Amino acid sequence: MPRILCIILSGGRGERLYPLTKERAKPAVPFGGKYRLVDIPISSCIHSGYKQIYVLTQYASSSLHNHIANTYIFDSFTQGFVEILAAEQTHEHSSWYMGTADAVRKNFLHFHTQDPDYYIILSGDQLYRMDLREFFRNHLESQAEVSVAVTPVTRERAPHFGILEVDGQGRIVQFVEKPPADRDISHLRIPANLAANLKGLKPGREYLASMGIYIFNAGILEKALDNDLTDFGKEIIPQSIGRLKIQAYLFPGFWEDIGTIKSFYETNISLTTITPEFDFYNEDHPIYTRRRDLPASKINACVINQSLTADGCIITNANIMNSIVGIRTIIESGATLDGVVCMGADYYETAEEKARNRSLGIPDIGIGRGTLIRKAIIDKNARIGEVCRIGVDSLARPEGDFGHYYLRDGVIIIPKNAVVPSGSVI
């Protein structure tokens, strides 16, 4: 059996997801009420039978380390692991990770202990469900040295991705990084014979975007990184075209890069629809996450429509529509949420802590009585007082940092541990 090592890249600063990444790495951002983004690629690896997994971290990684260490613990009869490799300074490497390729290069010393035949390299901040065995089978059958997972996109979305040109056999012959909207890229369209074999290909999706997921033959990867290049997508893959056999693997399923506040918000809210494109309710391929042993949510006299409510919530006489309600969320009487992504809380406050809140004049963790919130992201442990109005009007406002809240991509964000006094209007 070939030895396959999975590497999940989780070291980015996630600046476009700020302030959600103010105190945590992007793959540690809560998602879907109870998960972390990094749970997605780890689950795909485990379901595919690839259980030797390294997670490369660097920026604000404490929360990510804690989550992985408390979640992915294999028994002694399984020759598998999910191990964190934090950026470190050594005699050979005195700088931090300079990019995705540089992160892998600086960890070969650790990878060599597993003596892999192949590397599967994944990103820690995407939403998809992939059988990596099919990806690997395609890699072997095509006799490729490198394989790149690709997904069909429209011309309108092409400027956000690296776009690949392939021949009739799926070999990659050209790579164009984020082509401008006014540039003619008609020659990059999916070949007709390949498009005909793509089941469920939606109209208008005529171009192939790199998903940032790769398979490398072990020796090929080491040779490809025997230089100072720092990034797979911008440098390693484009400069290897013509020198190496690089094959495209056309992934037919749902895939979304959760790299901005807009995509994060919209992808979360899409989970509340009746038939979401990505479905967490999959018996054959569940998404794993940390077991918290929380009680069932307690819901009293509420109206809840097209929403997801995670474990351990206490919701009283509230009106909730098209929203995600994360773990341990407390919502008091008369509150209304419409289009809200609420990440929940890390703990329940005790009676003594609530009494101290009264003496300090701050709200309890959760959402206070009579508060109305629309189109917002509420990060963990936020304290929102009574009769607040957040996102109620539709007036256009400049984006930026306003102290206890942020405005990004038209979405209001209440950051982690924020305090919003009673009666606030945002």
Regions found by a protein language model. Give the residues of each.
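Left-handed beta-helix
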Residues: 1-5, 194-204, 218-426
